[in-house]
Curated annotation (Swiss-Prot):
Probable transcription factor that binds to the DNA sequence 5'-CAAT[GC]ATTG-3'. This is Homeobox-leucine zipper protein HOX7. Pfam families: HALZ (PF02183), Homeodomain (PF00046). Expressed in seedlings, roots, leaves, nodes, internodes, flowers and embryo. Residues 167-183 have a biased composition (Basic and acidic residues). Belongs to the HD-ZIP homeobox family. Class II subfamily. Residues 89-99, 121-135 have a biased composition (Polar residues).
Length: 349
């Protein structure tokens, strides 16, 4: 009976139906009880194949062996076995049916987690555990010999050892194997410890240098940012001033139309009284392109047409007029006013 109760502790109940076979009374021997369990498993397999619906019957009715005569012929009463393993359940029918089709070994007791934990391990597992422990101990010993246990145990150096290592680092940041062994023997340390100290010292030096470079770059960046902002303000001010100047003072018109010899000084002899010389000087000084009309002024044309007074004929009124009023040429300024538009001085002045 203990075997049957242990099988009933399984949390996965299944629905079982049995074929119309004679019901065995549980008071018989153990072999017959095993036969009753096998018949129940086979009946469950047939129930999955036929998909027949059954009803349950109490274990007391199964033990008494009562049969309902009102049922149609060919249908057998459904018995719920006394084992909780075969209690019907609609929710877990598929999973339990799969387990039943695989079959159960009724002669073996199901494994229990607590019992397994309490059992003594086999000799092979004990040997493997001891082997793993030995390997771990060997690795720990190797790390301790090579100085690799720094993460678990920090190296403590005296002041003399630290100062000597600092002086050695200032001389040589890296050590050769011979220097490393000599330094380790002198300081009563292992070569691995000396090597690790130098590695850490180089890392700290590099980190400090990186921090210094970072601060320097930050200052340079801030200075360049301020300079860039100042230049942008100056550019904005210059652009505003250029717009104001362009709108207030339009460009002068006609400066590119000035004669090419505007800066040249023209001087005429004051004792010259010949009108031809005056007309020639006027024609040489001013090109016809100065005037927008394209033609020479009427005064210059008339002056060019006046005959010379030294030709023997009496001077006419126009000749007397030009002879009395001799033009006076002086230096031209930047903004030159044509002499034809300037008031000519009198002869008495």
């Amino acid at each position: 009976m203990e075997l049957e109760l242990s099988l009933g502790d399984s949390p996965a109940p299944v629905k079982a139906t049995i074929a119309p076979t004679p019901v065995l009374i549980p008071t018989c021997m153990g072999d017959e009880e095993d036969l009753e369990l096998v018949l129940g498993v086979r009946a469950t397999r047939r129930d999955e194949q036929d998909d027949q619906t059954t009803c349950t019957q109490s274990s007391e009715e199964a033990m008494e062996g009562e049969e309902d005569e009102t049922r149609p012929h060919g249908e057998a009463p459904v018995e719920s076995l006394s084992f909780p393993l075969f209690v019907s359940s609609a929710e877990t029918g598929s999973a339990n049916s799969e387990m039943c089709t695989r079959g159960f070994d009724v002669n073996t007791r199901p494994a229990d987690g607590g019992a397994e934990a309490g059992r003594p391990s086999s000799p092979s597992s004990m040997q493997e555990a001891s082997t793993r422990q030995q390997v771990a101990d060997q690795e720990a010993a190797d790390d301790e010999d090579n100085g690799g246990g720094g993460a678990r145990k920090k190296l403590r150096l005296s002041k003399e050892q630290s100062s000597f290592l600092e002086d050695s680092f200032k001389e040589h940041s890296t050590l050769t194997p011979k220097q490393k062994s000599d330094l380790a023997n002198r300081l009563n340390l292992r070569p691995r410890q000396v090597e690790v100290w130098f590695q850490n010292r180089r890392a700290r030096t590099k980190l400090k240098q990186t921090e210094v470079d970072c601060e320097h770059l930050k200052r340079c960046c801030e200075r360049l940012t301020r300079e860039n902002r100042r230049l942008q303000r100056e550019v904005a001010e210059l652009r505003g001033a250029l717009r104001t100047t362009t709108s207030s003072y339009p460009p002068l018109y006609g400066l590119h139309h000035l004669p090419a010899a505007a800066g040249t000084v023209f001087r005429v002899c004051p004792s010259c009284e010949h009108s031809k010389v005056v007309a020639a000087a006027a024609s040489e000084s001013f090109s016809p392109r100065v005037f927008a009309g394209g033609g020479a002024p009427a005064a210059i044309t008339a002056a060019a047409a006046v005959p010379s007074p030294g030709a023997g004929s009496p001077p006419s009124s126009s000749a007397a007029l030009f002879g009395a009023r001799r033009p006076h040429f002086g230096p031209f300024a930047a903004a030159v006013i044509p002499p034809v538009l300037r008031r000519q001085p009198s002869a008495t002045s």
